[in-house]
């Protein structure tokens, strides 16, 4: 790989390490998402804690963390493997942020930003699948897991050269949702819609 690729991998990790959920909650006077709700510093938990505008900000910021480094990598005409590693680095930064004691979120929005920059068509299909599962079940976690399971197939259909790095990112997402998967299996997972209606 080139020096540009290595620099972008480092930049993507550091950008991913900026935990927007903590920052937006502090600015909005909301409780630390790591200490409330699901204890996950992500947009869904910020929404659970009552910060609708903050949640939108977190969602957009986290998506851009994945999207921007990959777009820059495309502009630099890097190889698919290098671009994939840059996207993976952004997700690793979000999940294991160096600026926040390596306690980060689950990486769904950041991963989606990566997928969006790789293929708009594939990522649009993914978000449609996410919405269908969410509307049917009201489980945000299940929607994310289904998206992670199907994303490599969608990428393979439209940008097959990125299938392997996308599959690596999806394995990371599923790993980060292992607690949610266990709660879903036991019937103990909380529906996002029910939580919002109770506020």
Swiss-Prot record:
InterPro entries: G3P_acylTferase_PlsY. It is a multi-pass membrane protein. Its main location: membrane. One of its GO terms (biological process) is phospholipid biosynthetic process. GO terms for molecular function: acyl-phosphate glycerol-3-phosphate acyltransferase activity. Keywords: Cell inner membrane, Cell membrane, Lipid biosynthesis, Lipid metabolism, Membrane, Phospholipid biosynthesis, Phospholipid metabolism, Transferase, Transmembrane, Transmembrane helix. It comes from the Bacteria. It catalyses: an acyl phosphate + sn-glycerol 3-phosphate = a 1-acyl-sn-glycero-3-phosphate + phosphate. SMART domains: G3P_acyltransf (SM01207). GO terms for cellular component: plasma membrane. Pathway: Lipid metabolism; phospholipid metabolism. The chain crosses the membrane at residues 5-25, 54-74, 82-102, 114-134, 154-174. It is found in: Cell inner membrane. Probably interacts with PlsX. Belongs to the PlsY family. Catalyzes the transfer of an acyl group from acyl-phosphate (acyl-PO(4)) to glycerol-3-phosphate (G3P) to form lysophosphatidic acid (LPA). This enzyme utilizes acyl-phosphate as fatty acyl donor, but not acyl-CoA or acyl-ACP. This is Glycerol-3-phosphate acyltransferase. It comes from Haemophilus ducreyi (strain 35000HP / ATCC 700724).
């Amino acid at each position: 790989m080139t020096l540009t690729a290595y620099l972008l991998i480092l930049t993507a990790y550091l950008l991913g390490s900026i935990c927007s959920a903590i920052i937006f909650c502090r600015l909005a006077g909301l409780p630390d998402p790591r200490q409330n709700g699901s204890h996950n510093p992500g947009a869904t938990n910020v929404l659970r804690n009552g910060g609708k505008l903050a949640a939108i900000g977190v969602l957009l910021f986290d998506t851009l963390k994945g999207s921007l480094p990959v777009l820059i990598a495309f502009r630099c005409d890097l190889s698919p493997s290098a671009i994939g590693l840059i996207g993976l680095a952004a997700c690793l930064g979000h999940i294991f942020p160096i600026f926040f004691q390596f306690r980060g979120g689950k990486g769904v929005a950041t991963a989606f930003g990566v997928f969006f920059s790789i293929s708009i068509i594939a990522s649009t299909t993914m978000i449609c699948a996410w919405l269908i599962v969410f509307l049917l079940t009201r489980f945000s976690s299940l929607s994310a897991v289904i998206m992670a399971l199907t994303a490599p197939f969608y990428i393979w259909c439209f940008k097959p050269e990125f299938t392997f790095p996308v599959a690596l990112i999806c394995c990371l997402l599923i790993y980060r949702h292992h607690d949610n998967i266990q709660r879903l299996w036991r019937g103990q997972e909380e529906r996002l819609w029910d939580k919002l209606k109770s506020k």
